[in-house]
From Swiss-Prot:
It is a multi-pass membrane protein. SUPFAM superfamilies: F1F0 ATP synthase subunit A (SSF81336). Belongs to the ATPase A chain family. InterPro entries: ATP_syn_F0_a_bact/chloroplast, ATP_synth_F0_asu, ATP_synth_F0_asu_AS, F0_ATP_A_sf. One of its GO terms (molecular function) is proton-transporting ATP synthase activity, rotational mechanism. Its main location: membrane. GO terms for biological process: proton motive force-driven plasma membrane ATP synthesis. It is found in: Cell inner membrane. It comes from the Bacteria. This is ATP synthase subunit a. The chain crosses the membrane at residues 37-57, 98-118, 143-163, 208-228, 239-259. PANTHER family: ATP SYNTHASE SUBUNIT A, CHLOROPLASTIC (PTHR42823:SF3). Key component of the proton channel; it plays a direct role in the translocation of protons across the membrane. The gene is atpB.
Amino acid sequence: MAAPGEALTPSSYITHHLTNLSTYKLGLVAEESSFWNVHIDSLFFSVLTGLIFLGVFRAVARKATAGVPGKLQCAVEMVVEFVDKNVKDTFHGRNPLIAPLALTIFCWVFLMNLMDLVPIDFLPYPAQHWLGIPYLKVVPSADVNITMAMALGVFALMIYYSIKVKGLGGFAKELALHPFNHWIMIPFNLLIEVVSLLAKPLSLGMRLFGNMFAGEVVFILCAAMLPWYLQWMGSLPWAIFHILVILIQSFVFMMLTIVYMSMAHEDNDH
C-alpha cells in the first residue's frame, strides 16, 4: 500500500479500496486464510448499522403517540406495515417471531447497503491519514463473510423450525421420500433434496454479496479513472440507479427469508 502522501496508481487505488482491514493485515494472525482472520471494518459497520436500527426504532417506540405523528414515526410505521403485510401474505404458519425477524433483516440489510452511497474516500481517507488505519471498507454487505453469515443464520432457523414443526422423523422423511415416494429412490431423493437445501443459503448470501460488491466496484472505478472534479459525473447517475438496487436487494433478502420460514413451518406433504 502507498504511504500517506504518496499517489496511488488507478490499479493500486482499486486494490486498496477493495481490501478489508483484517486481523491478518494488522499482523494479529499468521495466515490470511486463517479462521481467526476477522474483517474488522465489516464487523464494525455491520454492528454500527444494527445499533442505528435498534436506536431509531426504540426511540420512535418510546415517543409514539396516538395523535399527530412526526415524520420519523410515520416513516417507521410505514416500514413496519409494509413488512407486516408481506409476512401475512407469504407466511401461513403461526410464529410471532417471523415478523420481527423479517423487519430486522429488511432494515439491517438496507442500512448496510446504504453505506454504498457514502463517497468512496469520505471515511477511508481520514481513517488512513488522521487515524493511521491503512484499510477501510465501509459496505458490510459487499463482504461475502457478512452476507453468508446472515444467510447461514437464516438457514439454521430454517432447519430448527423444520425439525420443531415436523419432528426429526418428519424432516428426514421429507428429505428421503420427495420428490419420488418409493424406497428404491431414497438415494436419488436425498441427493436432490440435500443439494436443494444447501443451495438456499448459498444463493441467499451470494446474491446480496454479488450485487453490492459489483456496485462498490463501479463507484471505485469512477473514482479511480476520473479526475476528482469529474467523478460526480460518473458516480451520480450510478448512485441514482443504485438506490433501486439497495432497496430491491433488501426486499429480496427479506422475502426469501419469509418464504424459507414458511416452508419450514409446512407440516404436510409437497
